């Protein structure tokens, strides 16, 4: 053992040295600093636009639908669960980084377009010209960071859709605060209620849908072995996100230019639901179908890579079957919670997640996927050691694993 390196009994770590792990910690600290600075910037931006009372009311309205949509998104994350800190990071990027950057670039682009096209034409076309490019790029950058810096977690299409949708959800939440603040200032609670139904209810999944397309492309790139597809998939996903965004924003702009007069009630109950049916629902169906295909591939990885682990004793036969049966796994976790409380539930969940992580770590090695040296992920043997430790702890607690 090299001098100064701490002893980690019973756990085999990758070959990365202290400097590798130092780089990882430095990157995490830098990311935390970015979130902190952009959070302050976003709060200052909102604080200069609206009084505190308006921010509180509109902030509550913008936050209300978030748990519902987050639950729908996380429902897609079935078999190979993503770490909570990365899910939160994706959401925060959309909420404080992408919105802050997009606000100022969109504002600058609108000024330029006004000077070139005139106020009427620019007002109608700017949301369809600049917003899709600026916003999908600022949101998509979070997915690029995850793709390159979290290779051990960003494994496939399902992961890409989940991370992308959470980035979009964070973006939509803060964007809604701005829109809600404007209409609340002008029209009070009646105006806020109107826009809440339009943006948070009828079209609340639009931004998650857009960025989910980018994530799906990157996720497919991660799992394919074809060089052409690996390069083409992210580009297709990114352009699909921008195209859908442009169509969504451009519909209203074209109606404005055409001179068609639409009443607020028609806009709320006909136009927006109609746009959702035409643009949103088919695209969401496609993403869900991609996710379902991704589930099947995840099941194959788990079953193929853990077959020999049953013989080794790392995974029991019953656990092997549980890992690809979400209903039964949930039932066992509920039983652990009812009999042994949060500690037993957490320990059993940890066992199941480590077993699945072992399967995907083996799959990465089989595909020749190289992880960054600073990414302190356990080796295959390290996962086996850790699983044995957790199993012993569960046995000592009297928790049945299956």
What are these regions (language model features)?
Residues 1-402:
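Hydrophobic alpha-helical segments at protein termini of multi-pass membrane proteins
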